[in-house]
A protein has these predicted regions:
Chain A
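...captures the hydrophobic TM-helix bundle architecture rather than a specific catalytic motif
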Residues: 1-195
Length: 195, 626
């Protein structure tokens, strides 16, 4: 790596700041996609349907995972290694549960005849949109789980403690972001039929 | 700061690989971006000469084309019609993304941001290195599409569906398009990695005293460019992902039940190709400013240095850059006036588009006001910077024509559009980039470029650029459509044959001029005159670094900044420039008692030499001196 630490002039840590910028970029990606949804819906020939209730469970799961993440982060600040491990593990489990729940949501949609690919039913592109948005979001959740796993490994190596919270605090920020991103997407997709 | 000393202590031996290839030093990465950009630029230019030959002599056989492209793409020395489209597409893609986005921003953001704000390197040198490697990989993937059997993408650099969404639409829509999309995804990753780094560096790593209002305008421009990229590229990524779903999985985001001659009606229904245009141009328009803003920033700096005057209206320059950056996000609809858009929406886009003329005019006015009665030094860089101002005016004016929804109905997809964007975005940005290369070449390589060759390069490029692109406006007004392979079949365009020949000859002339530049660039690296630390007597911090261009930039402490970047010809000082790291007069007075007398002596401003054609020629003929 570099031979010298970047000199700072008393501002926010550049790595953390870079993460915020990355999140801003991700936010733009999803504003683009949800805007595309609105524009396409405005064109007509659009099948409106209610988002299956299982996606509400996903939302609750992802909110719970944010709470366990806070638990892990607070434990790190208090030097509670066991708490870090437990909190991170719980977050990973909840994150995995979120993925499964999303997948089940797609199965439910499929049972209703709403597939990702709906040839001959142009109006059902609404379902393609929902699945595409959820899938692209899921990639970000997956990246988050990998990030959490790295943190967990680091906690076993005693690399995360009171005096070294930068990594876990960045992970914390990322995880809350992708969680609340889903909350936004869920609300968007929930209210979209009424636009 | 002690880290610099510590840095010198554990300075490790650098191997060839770590110094030139896998380098994390921002100065080396900037050179990597520059050289890759120059190579891509040459390829893009060669393509343009090939299709210009076709336009001027549609019936003539050029054995060289067959030799170069092979008998498949240029049978009997004539370009194949499909390959003509592919060349136009690749020329656009290469020039817009690879030369003028990565080549320009990548080179100068990397070189200038840390040096001009007083930082030892980027916020994350590692990410910076990744940014270059993703860019190189992306370039290789894009170029490799030239060699696939069905040819490269041929649907235009805007990759509108259905040509881009339907692999069987035309030969280039198959593998070539897949490679194009892969290359652009890699490019977006590179550009985001770079952009995040640039923003983070400017906001977090400025040296002591370097407030945002003391930043050189280059830094402002590159910073705002990075912000634009960060906010717009993800939207293209979103649009591109939906396109990939349409291509790969058979969804119908953009495809509807259109009828294909070969395959009958498509299985897709209900997709909206216009949706893609919205997503594309939401990036596409900011992209235009991503291209031009670094060039404007470079020009601001070069014009101020070589006029030996403070830049006129620094605050106005910054605000107009911000205004351009903000407006660029709400004008994308002007690329889509003829898509059947709601006229009210069209009117909104018309108004926002024309408002851009205001900050652009502010910038132009400020350039001219800076030049006005300046003690102008016509260095090579200065010539190119003034060339940029010329292109920015002549291309910007035609932008006002095209921004009018009603006029655009007539002019859309004609050569008027081609002429407009080549002048305002292509030539202006290339001239900004060349100006930057001539100006900061001493910083990159420690040597000066050859001055007479620079003038030859400038005049031939400048004249040929106008000869190629200016007549296009008249062709467009007469309704000549763009992207046509040959006008021989359309006798109504026959009057333009001779014009096409002139344009092609001018393009070849422009190409030859670039060979002069290449020779000058590469030979000056080795045999150029040594430049010294501050050859242009500029104020900014990059000229305070030692000539050896060390890792970490400054051997001792990072200089502290006491003033803005444009203290030129201040009558209070002996010299006509005062570098940013020189303490204020008050501080100076405590150290040296003599400063009062200095003030009186230098208060008398020498009368600037009148600029006549004679003095201009006299100055150009001088060898490498300033």
């Amino acid at each position: 790596m570099t031979t010298q630490a970047p000199e700072q002039t008393g501002r926010v840590n550049p790595k953390k700041f870079s993460l915020w910028l990355l999140l801003l970029g991700i936010l733009m990606l999803f504003s683009g996609l949800t805007s595309a949804y609105i524009v396409r819906k405005g064109d007509g020939n659009w099948f409106d349907f209610e988002i299956p209730s299982i996606f509400l469970y996903s939302t609750i799961i992802v909110l719970l995972s944010s709470i366990t993440m806070i638990w892990a982060y607070r434990a790190a600040k208090k030097d509670d290694i066991k708490g870090i491990k437990l909190g991170l593990s719980a977050t990973i489990i909840l994150g995995t549960a979120f993925i499964i729940s999303q997948y089940m949501g797609w199965l439910v949609l499929s049972d209703q005849g709403l597939h990702f690919v709906n040839p001959k039913y142009g109006d059902k592109v609404s379902a393609s949109f929902l699945i595409a948005i959820a899938a692209i979001h899921l990639v970000h959740i997956l990246a988050g789980i990998i990030y959490l796993a790295v943190m967990l490994i680091n906690s076993f190596r005693y690399k995360i403690h009171k005096k070294n919270t930068l990594q876990i605090s960045m992970c914390n920020t990322y995880w809350h972001f992708v969680g609340f991103l889903w909350v936004y997407l869920y609300m968007f997709l929930y209210f979209a039929p009424d636009f | 700061m002690s880290s610099s000393v510590a840095h010198a202590d554990h300075h490790h031996e650098e191997t060839f690989l770590s110094k030139y290839v896998f380098s994390m030093d921002h100065k080396m990465i900037s050179k990597q971006f520059l050289i890759t950009g120059i190579i891509m630029g040459l390829i893009g230019m060669a393509m343009s000469i090939a299709f210009r030959l076709q336009l001027a002599y549609p019936d003539t056989s050029f054995p060289i084309l067959e030799w170069f492209f092979g008998s498949k793409w240029a049978p009997d020395g004539k370009l194949d019609a499909g390959y003509y489209m592919a060349l136009v597409t690749m020329h656009g893609t290469i020039m817009v993304f690879y030369v003028l986005t990565a080549g320009l921003s990548g080179t100068f953001a990397n070189l200038l941001l840390p040096l001009q704000i007083g930082a030892r390197d980027m916020a994350s040198p590692f990410m910076n290195m990744l940014s270059y490697w993703f860019f190189l990989l992306s370039s290789i993937v894009l170029l490799s599409s030239l060699f696939v059997e069905t040819g490269p993408a041929s649907g235009g650099w805007t990759i509108y569906p259905p040509l881009s969404a339907l692999p069987k639409a035309m030969p280039g829509s198959g593998m070539g398009m897949t490679l194009w999309l892969t290359a652009i995804v890699l490019f977006i990753v590179s550009s985001l990695l770079g952009g995040i780094n640039y923003i983070s560096t400017v906001l977090n790593m400025r040296t002591k005293g370097m407030s945002m209002t003391r930043l050189p305008l280059t830094v402002w421009a590159l910073f705002l460019t990075a912000v634009l990229g960060l906010l717009s590229f993800p939207v293209l990524l979103g649009g591109g992902l939906l396109l990939l779903f349409d291509r790969g999985f058979g969804t119908s985001f953009y495809l509807s039940d259109i009828y294909l001659g070969s395959a009958g009606a498509l299985e897709h229904t209900g997709g909206s190709p216009i949706l893609f245009q919205h997503l594309f141009w939401f990036l596409g328009h900011p992209e235009v400013y991503i291209i031009i803003m670094p060039a404007l920033g470079i020009t601001s700096e070069i014009i101020a240095v070589n006029s030996r005057k403070p830049i006129f209206g620094y605050t106005a320059m910054v605000i107009s850059l911000m205004g351009i950056a903000f407006l660029s996000f709400i004008v994308w609809g002007h690329h889509m006036f003829i898509t059947g858009m709601n006229p009210l929406l069209g009117a909104v886009f018309l108004v926002t588009t024309l408002i851009i003329a205001v900050p652009s005019a502010v910038k132009t006015f400020n350039y001219l006001a800076t030049l006005w009665r300046g003690n102008i030094r016509f260095t090579n860089a200065m010539m190119f910077a003034i060339g940029l101002v010329s292109f920015f005016i002549s291309g910007g004016l035609t932008g006002i024509f095209l921004g009018n929804a009603t006029l655009d109905i007539q002019l859309h997809d004609t050569y008027f559009v081609v002429g407009h964007f080549h002048i305002v975005m292509g030539c202006a940005a290339i001239f900004g980039m060349l100006a930057g290369i001539y100006h900061w070449f001493p910083k990159m390589f420690g040597r000066l470029m050859n001055k007479p060759l620079g003038y030859i390069h400038f005049w031939f490029t400048f004249i040929s650029a106008y000869l190629v692109f200016f007549p296009m406006h008249f062709m467009g007004l007469a309704g000549v459509p763009r992207r046509y392979y040959a006008f021989t079949l359309l006798p109504e365009y026959g009057v333009w044959f001779d014009v096409n020949v002139v344009m092609t000859l001018a393009a070849i002339l422009g190409g030859i001029a670039q060979i002069v530049f290449l020779y000058n660039f590469f030979s000056s690296i080795f045999i150029g005159k040594k430049s010294g630390t501050n050859p242009w007597q500029a104020n900014t911090l990059e000229w305070t670094t030692p000539e050896e261009r060390i890792h970490g930039n400054w051997p001792g402490e990072i200089p502290t900044v006491y003033r803005w970047a444009y203290d030129y010809s201040n009558p209070a000082y002996d010299e006509d420039f005062m570098m940013q790291n020189v303490p204020d007069e008050g501080v100076e007075e405590e150290l040296f008692e003599t400063s009062k007398t200095k003030v009186n002596k230098s208060a008398k401003k020498p009368k600037p030499e009148a600029v006549t054609l004679f003095t201009l020629i006299k100055n150009w003929l001088k060898p490498n001196t300033i």
